[in-house]
Amino acid sequence: MKQGIHPEYHQVIFLDTTTNFKFLSGSTKTSSEMMEWEDGKEYPVIRLDISSDSHPFYTGRQKFAAADGRVERFNKKFGLKSNN
C-alpha cells in the first residue's frame, strides 16, 4: 500500500434520526459531534435519515404495488384484448 493516500479509518456511531437506533461501525467519514458508546468510549456520530431499522423493506412495512407490464398497459389503454 502506498503511504499517505488512504483516508483514516476509525470507529463511528451511526444514528438513525427516525428511530434513534444506533450502531457502531468502522468508517472513513467523521464528524465533530461526539457521543459515548456502551463501552464508555466517545466516538464521532454520523446522523442517518434512514437505516435498516427504519427502511420499509427491512421492517416489513413495504407496500407492493401491482405492476402491470408495458404491453398490458397499452392493451388496457387502447381497449385491445389479450390473446390468452
UniProtKB/Swiss-Prot annotation:
NCBIfam families, per the entry: L31, PRK01678.1
InterPro entries (UniProt xref): Ribosomal_bL28/bL31-like_sf, Ribosomal_bL31, Ribosomal_bL31_B, Ribosomal_bL31_sf
Keyword flag Glycoprotein: no
Gene3D superfamilies assigned: Ribosomal protein L31
BP term (GO), one: translation
Family stated for the protein in its record: Belongs to the bacterial ribosomal protein bL31 family. Type B subfamily.
Annotated keywords: Ribonucleoprotein, Ribosomal protein
GO cellular component assignments: ribonucleoprotein complex; ribosome
Organism for this UniProt entry: Staphylococcus aureus (strain NCTC 8325 / PS 47)
UniProt cross-references to PROSITE patterns, sorted A to Z: RIBOSOMAL_L31 (PS01143)
SUPFAM superfamilies from the UniProt entry: L28p-like
Pfam families for this protein: Ribosomal_L31
Gene Ontology terms for molecular function: structural constituent of ribosome
Subunit note: Part of the 50S ribosomal subunit.
Name of the molecule in the record: Large ribosomal subunit protein bL31B
